[in-house]
Amino acid sequence: METIYALSTAAGRAGIAVLRLSGPHARAALRALTGRKAGAPREAMLCRFRDPETHAALDRGLAIFFPAPASFTGEDVVELHIHGGRAVIAAMLRALGQLPGLRAAQPGEFTRRAFENGKLDLTEVEGLADLIDAETEAQRAQALRQMEGALGQLYEAWRARLMRALAYAEAEIDFPDEEVPGDLIAKLGPDIEALETEIAAHLDDGRRGEQLRDGVEVAIVGPPNAGKSSLLNRLAGREAAIVSDEAGTTRDVLEVRLDIGGVPVTLADTAGLREAAGAIEQEGVRRALARAEAADLRIVMVAPGVSGIGNGFALARPDDLRVLNKVDLGAEVPDGVIGISALTGQGIDALEAALAARVGSAYEAREHPVITRARHREGLADCAASLARAEAALKAGRDAELVAEDLRLAARALGRITGRVDVEDLLDVIFRDFCIGK
């Protein structure tokens, strides 16, 4: 096994940089750079780092040794905390490259070794990646729960129940002469039904976890000159869109990223909806309608004296936020409509509060684990389909072999999500529960 090394902190100038080594030669590399043995595990040691060939001083910093298996990767790990100048980092990386048995790590290789050594399952690996990429508080909370194992533990608990059911089925098939009740297959029905119900409820989540991870899309739609671009600028706090009295100024979808109540939101300003005269504006209207249809939430905006496709709120859906702009001109605000002035800022606080309440209630991070990736959903769907077949086979009185095969497929589908499929753990369950071979 090779020892790998890499810069663990972001590239560029900084006060501190951290280099990480992992593998059997990590301890020897530390001695080659410092002329000293590794200190006590997990204790910082002040060192002078030298070039292993010329012995020229490179930097002065801290070294920390994490012996296997109590480390991130499960291998011997060394962290070198050095000054974050580009020249210092480059010199230290060159020095590490001179040492035998060391090579530069590939992207994600430290985390891959952590997975291969059983320190993380795949959902925890994905949670770690999401935590690094988190931009908002809700994203951070969701990613941290997943990184700490909440999602993987749920799937492993379901898989353990499946393995137990499979063990009963296999026991009846493979050990007919042992003291195993003959009606075990019939007793599996309630357990399978309970698992089906729990997995179905988990799948029926409105894709909230995926949307929170990727961001919620909010589209501003309405006729030309309703003030959509002005509202985008007001909510963004900057001049992101061109504002003009000329109708049809916005011809493509303009996006800004916002943090609303801890939830990442992509706010999209769309072309004004009207019977466009030119081909370019017609394409803008087509894109606006498509974007509005695909959005998770829409702000339907109108203003006095403007008209377009679906005058007023004719295009509004029941869950849309309805906004009347230019109330500073004295327009009456109907019930269920938020009155604003994108020009003066009047009513913007009320709109932001309504938007935060709508987004927050639907997409805030939940206490229970949620699906965060399409592959999780696909694996759960495969598991549910196999369970449905197993239940149907039970009710039809088919052979135990058919039931066992579907239970096995269901367990493997869950195991693929966490990356811990193990064909040997079936025998462990059988011996523990039935004392076969005793």
From Swiss-Prot:
It comes from the Bacteria. Residues 215-360 form the TrmE-type G domain. InterPro entries: G_TrmE, GTP-bd, GTP-bd_TrmE_N, GTPase_MnmE, MnmE_dom2, MnmE_helical, P-loop_NTPase, Small_GTP-bd. Its cofactor is K(+). One of its GO terms (biological process) is tRNA methylation. GO terms for molecular function: GTP binding; GTPase activity; metal ion binding. It is found in: Cytoplasm. GO terms for cellular component: cytoplasm. (6S)-5-formyl-5,6,7,8-tetrahydrofolate binds at R20, E79, K119, K438. The keyword Nucleotide-binding applies. GTP binds at residues 225-230, 244-250, 269-272. Binds 1 potassium ion per subunit. Keywords: Cytoplasm, GTP-binding, Hydrolase, Magnesium, Metal-binding, Nucleotide-binding, Potassium, tRNA processing. It holds the Pfam family TrmE_N. The keyword Nucleotide-binding applies. Mg(2+) binds at S229, T250. Its EC number is 3.6.-.-. Its main location: cytoplasm. Homodimer. Heterotetramer of two MnmE and two MnmG subunits. Belongs to the TRAFAC class TrmE-Era-EngA-EngB-Septin-like GTPase superfamily. TrmE GTPase family. Exhibits a very high intrinsic GTPase hydrolysis rate. Involved in the addition of a carboxymethylaminomethyl (cmnm) group at the wobble position (U34) of certain tRNAs, forming tRNA-cmnm(5)s(2)U34. This is tRNA modification GTPase MnmE. It comes from Parvibaculum lavamentivorans (strain DS-1 / DSM 13023 / NCIMB 13966). The gene is mnmE.
